[in-house]
Structures are given as C-alpha cells and as structure tokens.
Amino acid sequence: MKELQDIARLSDRFISVELVNENLFDWNVKLHQVDKDSVLWQDMKETNTEFILLNLTFPDNFPFSPPFMRVLSPRLENGYVLDGGAICMELLTPRGWSSAYTVEAVMRQFAASLVKGQGRICRKAGKSKKSFSRKEAEATFKSLVKTHEKYGWVTPPVSDG
C-alpha cells in the first residue's frame, strides 16, 4: 500500500505505523506529536506518554471509503474522542471523506482536533485504566454519524483556523 511507504518516508517522525498481524488493512498508528503549546502535550510530558496509539482499519475499497479510526491508548477525555475511543470527525464518515485524503493528512487533522477540542489524558482513578473497546467505539461512531446526519455538522468559525 502506497500510504505505508509514504509514512515511512516522513522526516518529522510525526507518526509511525505497525501492521496488526501483518495485515495491510489493519494498522496501529503512533501519534508522536501534538501542538507543543497545548495542555495535551503537557499531559503527555507529565505522564511520560510518548505517543497516542490509534487503530485504523481500512475497508476493501479504500481510498474510496474512509478507514475506521479509534484511539487505543492512553484514555483521553474531550478532544472529540468519545466512548470506546471513537473519533468525532466528519472526514472519517462516508459523506465527509475524499479519496484524495492521505493517512498523514488525516492524522494531522486529528492531532489538531484533539488540541482544539481541549483533549486531555484521563487521570481519574479507575477510569484512566479502563481500556477502550472496538465494539463500543463502533457503536458510538455509528450513533454519532446518525445524529450528525440528522442535525448537521458544526463548522467552526473562520477565525478558529
């Protein structure tokens, strides 16, 4: 897959990829960098968190349909990360997806959304140790897409970048 080769060539080590069970359609992606002026970056430093681990599962018709993307660890609060590690981003839906998007671009958008949404590493006793589940993420994502299809997606003001 060309996407995998492109990521291997990145010079800034923004992300790194490992195949899950050598499956080209199932990736674990390590997000190594978020905005260094953000509270999330500060959380990462304080908790010795080197990266945010995500899972991307690609459909057979990728790049014409989006991958399913979810956070695996650490457990995050806010930042558009919902139950199960589901991610609330229109570009991850069939309606919002474009076959021109690259995994790198999606990951950069996700990193920006985490910061814009005031994402934080969960430090609440008990809750921070509970792992995200794929089943819960899929159900949450399906529900949020249904809600947004009914009520629309909020477009941030131009002043927000």
UniProtKB/Swiss-Prot annotation:
Catalytic activity: S-ubiquitinyl-[E1 ubiquitin-activating enzyme]-L-cysteine + [E2 ubiquitin-conjugating enzyme]-L-cysteine = [E1 ubiquitin-activating enzyme]-L-cysteine + S-ubiquitinyl-[E2 ubiquitin-conjugating enzyme]-L-cysteine
Protein EC: 2.3.2.23
Biological process according to GO: protein ubiquitination
Active-site residue list: 88 (glycyl thioester intermediate)
Matching CDD domains: UBCc_UBE2Q
Record pathway: Protein modification; protein ubiquitination
UBC core domain span: 1-154
Gene Ontology molecular-function annotations: ATP binding; ubiquitin conjugating enzyme activity
One Pfam assignment: UQ_con
InterPro entries: UBQ-conjugat_E2_core, UBQ-conjugating_enzyme/RWD
Keyword Transferase attributed: yes
Localisation: Nucleus
One term under GO cellular component: nucleus
Main function: Probable E2 ubiquitin-protein ligase that catalyzes the covalent attachment of ubiquitin to target proteins. May facilitate the monoubiquitination and degradation of MTOR and CCNE1 through interaction with FBXW7.
Family: Belongs to the ubiquitin-conjugating enzyme family.
Record-given protein name: Ubiquitin-conjugating enzyme E2Q-like protein 1
Lineage: Eukaryota, Metazoa, Chordata, Craniata, Vertebrata
